[in-house]
A protein has these predicted regions:
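Hydrophobic/aromatic-rich transmembrane helices and adjacent perimembrane loops
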Residues: 220, 225, 230-251
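Alpha-helical transmembrane segments at the extracellular/periplasmic loop-to-helix junctions
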Residues: 88-103, 120-204, 215-216
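Hydrophobic core segments of alpha-helical transmembrane domains in multi-pass membrane transport
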Residues: 24, 45, 70, 124-132, ...
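Transmembrane helix irregularities
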Residues: 22-34, 75-76, 228-232
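Membrane-interfacial entry segments at the cytosolic side of transmembrane helices
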Residues: 12-15, 54-64, 83-92, 108-123, ...
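Short hydrophobic alpha-helices at membrane interfaces in multi-pass membrane enzymes
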Residues: 5-25, 55-71, 217-221
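Transmembrane-embedded, aromatic-rich helix segments that form part
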Residues: 34-47, 63-65, 81-97, 240
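Transmembrane alpha-helical segments
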Residues: 1-5, 22, 39-50, 97-102, ...
């Protein structure tokens, strides 16, 4: 997906988008934990209008990726239509709609105060979306967004606690401690810290680390979300490892 949106050849970009959506959907059918990648991708799409100017390209490649991914995901038994029409699909469809509306807003205003208008629009969507999710979480027959099982919701909101003794008794559902985190990632933390410094430092030319604005945005997003999600279950430390490896690769 990242390689596709950076490609200069539209035919190659099209093939990469299709193949990327197939690989992501296939991986999600094998392990439900791969639903994590929906979070950074959704946040990344939200930020694309602010870091990219080739709006005509974004208008077709992002909807194509999201549509193909959701279509293939719905064909599999897992995660299935419940994911497509539930919170997972909402996390991808909402940013895609936001991106399209932002591009049209930019054309209407001729680019004047685009960042300010876009941020206000984004804030309004976040507020409205929060109210919708909270209202949908109340058990009733009018629920229109399918919520996943508790362990997936717990990954989004680590402050939640389970009341099911069976869930708490599973070893891999234990909360990671500081000792375990340092045991798993002690080496990666050093290089990841250097990578963060290189990424954010103004004294170092970004050309030296070969990152443009959209790549830097994705690295920051996946770094934050990976560490955040891994704070819930010990088995989700794999996402902290992925985030730290990506950041450490910059060093």
């Amino acid at each position: 997906f990242l390689s596709a949106i950076k490609s200069q050849n539209k035919k190659i970009a099209f093939l990469k988008i299709i193949s990327g959506s197939i690989v992501l959907a296939s991986g999600m059918s094998a392990w439900g934990g791969n639903q994590f990648f929906v979070i950074p991708i959704g946040l990344f799409i939200l930020g694309l209008p602010f870091v990219r100017k080739d709006y005509n390209f974004l208008l077709w490649c992002i909807p194509l990726f999201v549509g193909t991914f959701l279509l293939i995901s719905g064909l599999f038994e897992r995660p299935g239509p419940a994911f497509v029409f539930g919170l997972g699909g909402l996390v991808l469809v909402t940013p895609t709609i936001f991106l399209i509306l932002c591009i049209f807003l930019n054309k209407i205003t001729h680019g004047k105060n685009f960042v300010r208008n876009g941020l206000v629009f984004l804030l309004s969507i976040i507020v409205i979306g929060s109210f919708v999710i909270i209202a949908n979480g109340i058990p009733s027959e009018s629920n229109f967004v399918y919520l996943p099982s508790f362990r997936y919701v717990n990954a989004l909101f680590p402050i939640l606690t389970s009341t099911d003794p069976l869930v708490d008794s599973v070893a891999e559902h234990a909360s990671p401690t500081t000792d375990i985190s340092f045991l798993f990632h002690s080496v990666w933390m050093i290089f990841a810290g250097i990578g963060i410094w290189l990424l954010l430092s103004k004294k170092i030319s970004q050309n030296k680390i070969f990152l443009n604005n959209d790549s830097r945005l994705f690295v920051i997003i996946i770094g934050i979300t990976g560490v955040y999600v891994s704070s819930v279950f010990i088995r989700l430390e794999v996402f902290a490892s992925i985030s730290l490896i990506i950041l450490a690769s910059l060093a």
